[in-house]
Amino acid sequence: MPLSASNPFEQDVEKATNEHNNSEDWGLIMDICDKVGSTPNGAKDCLKAIMRRVNHKVPHVALQALTLLGACVSNCGRIFHLEVCSRDFATEARGIINKAHGKVSEKLKTLMVEWSEEFQKDPQCSLISATIKSLKEEGVTFPAAGSQATTNAAKNGSSLSKNKEDEDIRKAIELSLQEQKQQQMETKSLYPSAEIQQTNQNLRKVRALYDFEAVEDNELTFKSGEIIFVLDDSDTDWWKGENHRGVGLFPSNFVTSDLNVEPEAATVDNSCVPEDATEEIKKAEPEAVYIDEDKMDKTLQVLQSIDPTDLNLDTDLLDSEVICQQMGPMIDEKLEEIDRKHSELSELNVKVLEALELYNKLMNETPMYSAYSKLHHPAQYPPTSSGVSVQSYPVQPPSGNYMIQGVHQVTVSQGYGLGPDQMGQLRSLPQNINSSDCNLYTKSNRQRMCHMKAITTWQRFSKHTSER
């Protein structure tokens, strides 16, 4: 890893790992750890400066650099963990284990085993375990987890944390003295006043349950899991405390006195959570899912442009992907509805075409109204020629059954008695009716009925179309 000339950690790292040092300077090491969190791109720059000293030809310098590296991993948080679990560090660590001095190699392997145990629940920090497994396949031996070497490393980490706490207490006392002088000149703020109580006793420590971002100048910013020294807890809602970022006020329900509680497992009464936090929780609730073509297009575009080798997952992309997957059943229902409507319109189209075809067929046929008119004007019938057969319609017996020859006979189940006036009307019918005239009359009525049926079908189709 080449070291940039503008690396702000170069001077401090060289001083902490000087070959003339007889012991570790834990005060300077803690200052470097604090500087990582307060410097932009601090984790990457600090790791570069440390690895430059780990590759030093003097083993004493390399061992001190590894001690500093372990301190940074233990105290600088997740941002430094991700840098240690990068491919660049894994590649360089592989080279150091294979080529460096024996003690340097053993200490680095011990640290890697300790880190793999610490990071085993974090999928983004799995590269350390993968590197150890790969080196074991190549024949490199590593100390077992829980062995004497790793136990010593854990003890060093515990002593390091204790030294850090002592150093933080010392700094807190110094800052408290300065804060007391400045407090008298400051104007009264919107928050409850908090005066510094100076005692020679050890300060009370609490652990942060949630992240808190300072809004006012006199507030204290901290992250979940960090240790805060309480300077004043006289007010029930707002306490005054100190951490490596400075001194300020913070909400008392954001911390706990149990230092062993993990931030993820800690629970807080909802009634104690501020209204702003409640609003943020409500905003985090999933929104109602509906078919959104723009969201699907954007998600596809991001998926096509993303780097598959990037281990940092985009939470927005994951949320968009989940929402798009939830749209699947809704899209299926919409397609079924469209297919059903398409089938209905297809059937209706077939019926309309059949009706139009029947209508055109009937309009092309010319009905014979001349024969039909003869039936309604019997007095104008011309005399029957000798070539046309004449059929007579004799008067039936009193039973009242009359049949016309040439027309389909219909059996009447009950006879009807006719009076003299009805008999006279029947005798006045023309005596000669041709069977072809009756057939034309029946055909004309059938054409009218078909015509009316076609018009009715067309009206129903027009009404159905206007309703849609």
Swiss-Prot record:
Residues 164-183 form the UIM domain. It holds the Pfam family SH3_1. It is found in: Cytoplasm; Early endosome membrane. CDD domains: SH3_STAM2, VHS_STAM2. Keywords: Cytoplasm, Endosome, Membrane, Phosphoprotein, Protein transport, SH3 domain, Transport. Its main location: cytoplasm. It is a peripheral membrane protein. GO terms for cellular component: early endosome membrane; endocytic vesicle. Ubiquitously expressed. This is Signal transducing adapter molecule 2. It comes from Gallus gallus. The gene is STAM2.
